[in-house]
Amino acid sequence: LFDLVAKIGEKHLHQFEGGKAYVILPMPDKLKGKDILVIYIDDNGLCKILNHSVVKIGAEYYIRFTTPHFSTFAVVDKDEAEGLIKEQNAAHVKELMQSAKFKVTTTKTSKKSVKVQVAAKSSKTMISDIKSLGYTVKYQFYRSTKKTAGYKLLKTSSKNSFISTKGTKGRKYYYKARVLVYDGSKLVARSALKQCSYGARR
């Protein structure tokens, strides 16, 4: 672990207002010859990886990286860190999905079909934040002729909207949707089924 602090007089500098600090640290003896990562903990308590390079100066090896802020940094074994970060991210995503609020809406298209759309209500950046961690986000859309029962899956899609073109003309249908998060083919988390508050006629 390395704590990096800069001071002007008695004032600590934490951010560089768009600038960067260039840092060179000695390679820890126990990590010499191993693949390493340089990480720090962000404001959400998540480990983030910083790009780095290893340089040889004289007979010694050093780690070089840039940072837009000072923090507590760690140089760690790559294999061990990747496993821990993967577990941490999965737990974070599950927590997000459990507390997230989604809104499902229906609108009529120009061809009189019904467009169903789901969006995160609690955070506009939540889906993009999840994707930035390397996960795949998919959406499932359900329909029923009854508001409280009988919902059947219509579509699983990577898009957050779905156009329902089939159904009996004049009949009212009710729609639900949910959000799923995958790590490759493995389901990591999913939201509860969220219902559109009103029905839509074909």
PLM segments and residue spans:
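Short beta-strand segments within Ig-like beta-sandwich modules, predominantly Fibronectin type-III
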Residues: 53-55, 153-159
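Beta-strand-rich modules
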Residues: 164-184
